[in-house]
């Protein structure tokens, strides 16, 4: 917006009692003392943390491995595992890559990042760390 436009909007809004104020003055007015007393101090909304609670990775123990079916247009079987995280929570994690040797009681490193076609799966197992080996090269 240009300066002449702002000045024109200001003069017209002042002459008409702020009825046609530009967006510059469209914010809400200040709260009254009664409203501030009733509502109390402003509360910061809590930060929305993902399943790793703000950490980049978490260590976990595999409870069981299983296969999940993806959502509608896709048809492959996705390898997943149930993991007890170091925070004490249990979560379902996707195992990326072809072929894995994960079994019960294996220790894995888990990172955030959802699998788009698996509803409710928001974590991935990191390959090549702890008991989860690297993806093997095809021969």
From Swiss-Prot:
Chief localization: mitochondrion
Keyword Transit peptide assigned: yes
Single GO cellular component term: mitochondrion
Keywords on record: Mitochondrion, Ribonucleoprotein, Ribosomal protein, Transit peptide
GO molecular function, one term: structural constituent of ribosome
InterPro entries named in the record: NA-bd_OB-fold, Ribosomal_uS12, Ribosomal_uS12_bac
Transit peptide: 1-29
Localization: Mitochondrion
Protein's GO biological process: mitochondrial translation
Superkingdom of this protein's organism: Eukaryota
NCBIfam families linked to this entry: rpsL_bact (TIGR00981)
Subunit and interaction comment: Component of the mitochondrial ribosome small subunit (28S) which comprises a 12S rRNA and about 30 distinct proteins.
Family membership noted in the UniProt record: Belongs to the universal ribosomal protein uS12 family.
PANTHER family attached to this UniProt entry: 30S RIBOSOMAL PROTEIN S12 FAMILY MEMBER (PTHR11652)
Listed name of the protein: Small ribosomal subunit protein uS12m
């Amino acid at each position: 917006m240009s300066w002449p436009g702002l000045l024109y909007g200001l003069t017209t809004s002042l002459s008409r009692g702020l009825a046609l104020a530009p967006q510059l003055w469209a914010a809400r007015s200040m709260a009254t003392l009664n409203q501030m007393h009733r509502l109390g101090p402003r509360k910061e909304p809590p930060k929305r943390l993902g399943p790793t609670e703000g950490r980049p990775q978490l260590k976990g123990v595999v409870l069981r491995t299983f296969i999940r079916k993806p959502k509608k247009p896709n048809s492959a079987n996705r390898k997943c595992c149930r993991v007890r995280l170091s925070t004490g929570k249990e979560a379902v994690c996707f195992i990326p890559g072809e072929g894995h040797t994960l079994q019960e009681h294996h220790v894995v490193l888990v990172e955030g990042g959802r699998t788009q076609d698996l509803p409710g799966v928001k974590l991935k197992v990191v390959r090549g760390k702890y008991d989860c080996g690297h993806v093997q090269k095809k021969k």
